[in-house]
A protein has these predicted regions:
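Structured catalytic/nucleic-acid-binding cores of DNA maintenance enzymes
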Residues: 1-253
Length: 253
């Protein structure tokens, strides 16, 4: 699933090509046809959500879930995915923006309402970590690993940055939320934010050490084979180092 840093980069790419441009065609016609002739006035990432705003007050709200993505082409350029996978197409004089496979594509009159349920966006320049901590205190998540994926607590963190931020902090993903103090959670959130900020703004694919995707391979820090197990109701695969993130790990580091 694209995480907040990926959506941030996507929004930046769309903003460069669409901001201030007039839509000459929009498909599907039945749902997006009324965007024809409208000017794009903003592109904003909100956690894992993306909003494209128009001068008539409407906004195109998309969420990529597991397999969705936005592509940008020149008119006449061959698409890298089949046309039948397109869920939204916006054309301007020099750009064709195509959203493929997104399960959520909707035109909304109140874009704030569409994302009101989300916690503070971790990549927002005004990220409110204290509000995220207040929301965490009300979360029903049992473990710290599950809490970090709760988008109503903090929007944007996904499984990759969850695993790697916890590893960097030396904290077991199965640590009960009930035994996690605010200082520890603040440190994890700010670590995830910094990792995601570097990822969002780096040229190319940034190389940051971590354990995600390394099940059975050596931990980059201590060499212990990385463990992997499904976690939470969604059974997301969680990667962690039993030595670096076990009892006393913070002291050893």
């Amino acid at each position: 699933m694209p995480e907040g840093d990926t959506i941030w980069r996507t929004a930046a790419a769309l903003r460069r090509r669409l901001d201030g441009q007039v839509v000459t065609a929009a498909r599907p016609q039945a749902t997006l046809g009324r965007l024809r002739g409208r000017r794009v006035v903003g592109v904003e990432p909100v956690g894992k959500h993306l909003l494209i705003r128009f001068d008539n007050g409407l906004a195109l709200h998309t969420h990529m879930r597991m397999h969705g993505s936005w592509h940008v082409y020149a008119p006449g350029e061959r698409w890298r995915r089949p046309e039948h996978l397109a869920r939204a197409v916006l054309e301007t004089g020099d750009t064709v923006a195509v959203c493929f496979l997104a399960p959520l594509v909707e035109l909304v009159a109140d874009d704030r309402a569409a994302v009101r349920h989300l916690g503070p966006d971790i990549l927002d320049t005004q990220f409110d970590v204290e509000e995220a901590l207040r929301r965490a205190a009300r979360s029903h998540a049992d473990t710290l690993g599950e809490l970090l994926l709760d988008q109503t607590v903090c929007a944007g963190i996904g499984n990759i940055h969850k695993c790697n931020a916890l590893w960097q902090c030396g904290i077991d993903p199965w640590t009960p939320v009930s035994s996690t103090d605010a200082a520890t959670l603040r440190r994890v959130l700010l670590t995830a934010r910094e990792r995601m900020r570097r990822s969002a703004t780096a040229r190319g694919v940034p190389r940051q050490p971590g354990v995600h995707g390394r099940g059975g391979r050596p931990c980059p820090r201590c060499g212990t084979p990385v463990s992997v197990r499904a976690q939470g109701m969604l059974a997301r695969l969680t990667y962690w180092c039993t030595r670096c993130q076990g009892p006393g790990a913070t002291r050893r580091r």
